[in-house]
Amino acid sequence: MKFDVLTLFPELFNTVMGESIIGRAQKNRLVEVNAVNIRDYSKDKHKKVDDYPFGGGNGMVMMCQPVIDAYKAISEGMEQKPKVIYMSPQGKVLTQEMAKELSKQEHLILLCGHYEGIDERIIEEIIDEEISIGDYVLTGGELPAMVLIDCVSRLIPGVLSTEGSFSDESHFNGLLEYPQYTRPADYNGNKVPEVLLSGHHANIEKWRMQQSLDRTRDKRPDLFNKLPNKNLL
């Protein structure tokens, strides 16, 4: 899967996305993250990419020309237009279900806003969907884009060692993940639950499911209330 990221700070992606699981996925050619510097497409002699908002107001707004020209440079000659996502606080909040759907795409283009936002005509011309990672404000769209890339890439076959690596995680099946333990079995008198040491796999699975249900009910009642047949759980 290919991610083209339109950004003013490509070096952030070259550093962070080259490490850990995503870095390995790129080396194995399962994922490609290509950071495109919007400033390279500015026709201004000073490579300016922003200007004052019409009607007044604080801050600067990213201009149409550099952004749309950067997009055209990526998509030119393609038979099928890639899905273009604007990382925006006004978008739908990213969920695991959304990530599953996005992982079915072969190519995504992510636009990272900055300053006070982008010219509305960019959204009208090239954006298919706006996505947020939460109801709060960040300096730019780079961190949200990295979150989306990480979340989606984990669902691509081969990126993780086994499917179980993500199918047991929090949110994958609508539940929070059960507690995890490692050695030693007794740390300063705080012991690992006996069932995990028993070797009885059916009992372990039953314990884990109950723990997931309890955690979801206690920590995220909003998720628990969405579960089907929750009254029978």
Swiss-Prot record:
This is tRNA (guanine-N(1)-)-methyltransferase. Belongs to the RNA methyltransferase TrmD family. Homodimer. Disulfide bonds: none annotated. The keyword Transferase applies. Its main location: cytoplasm. It is found in: Cytoplasm. Specifically methylates guanosine-37 in various tRNAs. It comes from the Bacteria. GO terms for biological process: tRNA N1-guanine methylation. InterPro entries: Alpha/beta_knot_MTases, tRNA_m1G_MeTrfase_C_sf, tRNA_m1G_MeTrfase_TrmD, tRNA_m1G_MTases_N, tRNA_MeTrfase_TRMD/TRM10. Its EC number is 2.1.1.228. It comes from Ruminiclostridium cellulolyticum (strain ATCC 35319 / DSM 5812 / JCM 6584 / H10) (Clostridium cellulolyticum). Pfam families: tRNA_m1G_MT. It catalyses: guanosine(37) in tRNA + S-adenosyl-L-methionine = N(1)-methylguanosine(37) in tRNA + S-adenosyl-L-homocysteine + H(+). Keywords: Cytoplasm, Methyltransferase, S-adenosyl-L-methionine, Transferase, tRNA processing. Gene3D superfamilies: 3.40.1280.10, tRNA(m1g37)methyltransferase, domain 2. GO terms for cellular component: cytosol. GO terms for molecular function: tRNA (guanine(37)-N1)-methyltransferase activity. PANTHER family: TRNA (GUANINE-N(1)-)-METHYLTRANSFERASE. S-adenosyl-L-methionine binds at residues 113, 133-138.
